A protein has these predicted regions:
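Conserved catalytic-core segments of large NTP-driven translation/proteostasis enzymes
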Residues: 1-123, 127-134, 139-149
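Well-ordered beta-strand positions in beta-sheet-rich domains
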Residues: 26, 85-87, 181, 220-223
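Short coil-to-beta transition motif at edge beta-strands of beta-rich domains
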Residues: 60-67, 165-172, 206-207
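Short, aromatic- and glycine-rich surface loops/edge beta-strands on solvent-exposed regions
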Residues: 125, 208-211
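Basic, glycine-rich polyanion-binding accessory segments appended to enzymes
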Residues: 129-203
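Charged, surface-exposed alpha-helical interface/stalk elements
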Residues: 183, 201-206, 216-220, 227-228
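Conserved small/polar residues in nucleotide/adenosyl-binding loops
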Residues: 229-233
Length: 233
């Protein structure tokens, strides 16, 4: 009863985003799997599966794709991240095999990747796009801090004000399905630089959230859009 009125109110407050089918294809990876059972014969092995939400554009079977940040490559004392290159062998959404999937909802993507790469959600938090359409990979973030007025509490905890960031403080960063930890390397007024332990792949202007460890839990303290703006001390 009155569902039409409820939907109208929701649309008026939180409009459905414009999901163009012709835009740059972008998918947030939330899960990744190895679907092969123990004892399977080599000829029956299947490639890795990734699952998530297409947020822009569309993808089709046969598309060449990149998954970033990808895999960690160690060269002596230096570490770099290398995007994974592969192709889409199959798409499934709602239990149905598809030739093309568009933005909105969840889907699973079959690839020829080594299942060892995708097992146990190892690719969770990564981003999938076509060659030349991949967002930047960020190992450092320069933020114009937008801290909340109060820290969100639960249970018997008391809400309190949020103190400014401190040099070398460790924060948790969330960007879409990705989670990383960053160390505050520089602060100036309401701006700060963070060095990330794990890089994130995100479009410029996309929003990240910041959480601070309070006791044994992480508490949301602020947010900021990703930007190329550099912090000058």
């Amino acid at each position: 009863v009155n569902l039409d009125i409820l939907i109208e109110a929701i649309q008026g407050t939180i409009p459905t985003p414009d999901r163009s089918k012709d835009g740059v294809g972008l998918m947030y990876v939330a899960r990744s799997f190895d679907v092969n059972r123990p004892g399977i014969r080599p000829e029956g092995l299947k490639g890795g599966i990734i699952g998530g939400s297409i947020v822009e554009g569309s993808f089709s079977v046969g598309d060449s794709i990149l998954i970033a940040p990808g895999r960690r490559v160690q060269n002596g004392s230096k570490t770099r991240w290398e995007p994974l290159r592969t192709t889409i062998e199959g798409i499934q959404g709602g239990g149905i095999d598809l030739e093309t999937a568009h933005a909105g909802g969840l889907c699973g993507i079959s690839t020829p990747l080594d299942p060892l790469t995708t097992k146990a959600d190892d690719l969770s938090g990564q981003v999938m796009a076509r060659e030349g359409e991949l967002p930047p990979i960020w190992g450092e973030l320069n933020l114009n801090l937008q801290l909340l007025e109060k820290m969100v509490a639960s249970g018997t905890e008391e809400e309190g004000g949020i103190r400014p960031l401190q040099p070398n403080e460790m924060l948790m960063i969330n960007s879409a399905t990705a989670t990383s930890v960053g160390t505050v390397s520089a602060i100036k007024a309401k701006r700060a630089s963070l060095d990330l332990r794990l890089p994130i792949c995100a479009k410029e202007g996309s929003r990240i959230t910041l959480s601070r460890r309070v006791g044994s839990r992480w508490r949301l303290i602020g947010h900021d859009p990703v930007s190329y703006t550099h912090l000058t001390l």
